[in-house]
């Protein structure tokens, strides 16, 4: 299972929001590229980038920064946030992005998603951002009447490669992942799923790892890494390739490059 660090971009900085609230912004670093290189050095198998400006406005505000990050890394990068047109997705892939995570457009223009999935097989994923089980859109500012499980089944039928499931009410809270909701989703789709939202500790990572036989392939971690509640190297050793059965205590400390 992949443990995937998240870098949320807002105004060119690395930030975290609490439950997707743009009024509750914590700036963790002014240089997202330095953060990306740091996570790669600690063993991240891939990186999850979110353009929060684009998620809110639909305009790619951090396009150049994303390209710079992708060009500087050796690990694959997946990007979400505000990808609502064919051109926006094509531009990202031209920059070397590995996967595009589509959100709002999956509800508003499913035919476009199906077309993109056919054009870029294996590279189009859908972000299922759920509030009380219902899909939220436009940077989580609006909540639909569509269940995440229903959207997942529709999108799987249209050929998307997988899903990133985020429990909005747990995102940025360190309250632990929503295991029951993940089980429900995994039960209705045969596509791989990446979990996001609330992951706070190595125990949470191990709880998610128990779902891998059912199709869970990764966990996105944000605040727990930035507040040092979790050590990325330990998490990767615990559930990644060549994982250790016993995790030694981390007696050292880490600092930014």
Curated annotation (Swiss-Prot):
Enzyme active site: 8 (proton acceptor), 129 (proton donor)
Catalytic activity: 1-(5-phospho-beta-D-ribosyl)-5-[(5-phospho-beta-D-ribosylamino)methylideneamino]imidazole-4-carboxamide = 5-[(5-phospho-1-deoxy-D-ribulos-1-ylimino)methylamino]-1-(5-phospho-beta-D-ribosyl)imidazole-4-carboxamide
One record GO biological process: L-histidine biosynthetic process
Enzyme class: isomerase
The UniProt record lists the keyword Cytoplasm: yes
Record pathway: Amino-acid biosynthesis; L-histidine biosynthesis; L-histidine from 5-phospho-alpha-D-ribose 1-diphosphate: step 4/9
SUPFAM superfamilies membership: Ribulose-phoshate binding barrel
Protein's name in the database: 1-(5-phosphoribosyl)-5-[(5-phosphoribosylamino)methylideneamino] imidazole-4-carboxamide isomerase
Origin species: Thermosynechococcus vestitus (strain NIES-2133 / IAM M-273 / BP-1)
Organism taxonomic ancestry: Bacteria, Bacillati, Cyanobacteriota, Cyanophyceae, Acaryochloridales
């Amino acid at each position: 299972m992949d443990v995937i660090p998240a870098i949320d971009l807002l105004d060119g900085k690395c930030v975290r929001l609490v439950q997707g609230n743009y009024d509750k912004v914590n700036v963790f670093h002014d240089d997202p590229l330095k953060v990306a290189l740091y996570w790669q050095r600690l063993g991240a198998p891939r990186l999850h980038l979110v353009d929060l400006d684009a998620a809110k406005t639909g305009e790619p505000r951090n396009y150049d920064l994303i390209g710079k990050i992708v060009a500087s890394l050796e690990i694959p990068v997946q990007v979400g946030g505000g990808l609502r047109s064919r051109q926006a997705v094509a531009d990202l892939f031209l920059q070397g992005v590995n996967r595009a995570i589509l959100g709002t457009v999956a509800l508003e223009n499913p035919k476009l998603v199906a077309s993109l999935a056919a054009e870029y097989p294996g590279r189009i994923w859908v972000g299922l951002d759920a509030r009380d089980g219902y899909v939220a859109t436009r940077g989580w500012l609006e909540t639909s009447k569509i269940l995440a499980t229903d959207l997942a089944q529709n999108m799987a039928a249209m050929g998307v490669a997988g899903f990133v499931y985020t429990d909005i009410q747990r995102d940025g809270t360190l309250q632990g992942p929503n295991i029951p909701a993940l089980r429900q989703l995994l039960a209705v789709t045969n596509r791989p799923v990446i979990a996001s939202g609330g992951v706070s500790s190595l125990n949470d990572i191990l709880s998610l790892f128990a779902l891998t036989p059912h199709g869970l392939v990764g966990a996105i971690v944000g605040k727990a890494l930035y507040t040092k509640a979790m050590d990325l190297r330990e998490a990767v050793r615990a559930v990644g390739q060549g994982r250790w059965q016993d995790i030694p205590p981390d007696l050292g400390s880490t600092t930014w490059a």
